[in-house]
Amino acid sequence: MDRTAAQNARESLDLAFSISNFLQTGLDRHTLSILIALCEHGVNPEALAAVVKELRREAAALHQHQDQS
């Protein structure tokens, strides 16, 4: 990747991360970059959103179970 392309990619990720924070998605920069890359490779964004939601539900249930133990 040349310098200009790398700079454009960085700026695009910065913008996406700013929007993500504004929308209070709770996604960190690294996770967001992975999700964007998956979308760029043809993964359905709605399916990814469903997976993220399910993983968050599972993590919350696990934490709740651990707190009760």
UniProtKB/Swiss-Prot annotation:
It holds the Pfam family MOZART1. It comes from the Eukaryota. Its main location: cytoplasm. The keyword Disulfide bond does not apply. Keywords: Cytoplasm, Cytoskeleton. One of its GO terms (cellular component) is interphase microtubule organizing center. It is found in: Cytoplasm, Cytoskeleton, Microtubule organizing center; Cytoplasm, Cytoskeleton, Spindle. InterPro entries: MZT1 (IPR022214). The keyword Cytoplasm applies. One of its GO terms (biological process) is microtubule nucleation by interphase microtubule organizing center. PANTHER family: MITOTIC-SPINDLE ORGANIZING PROTEIN 1 (PTHR28520:SF2). Part of the gamma-tubulin complex. Required for gamma-tubulin complex recruitment to the microtubule organizing centers (MTOCs). Belongs to the MOZART1 family. This is Mitotic-spindle organizing protein 1. It comes from Picea sitchensis.
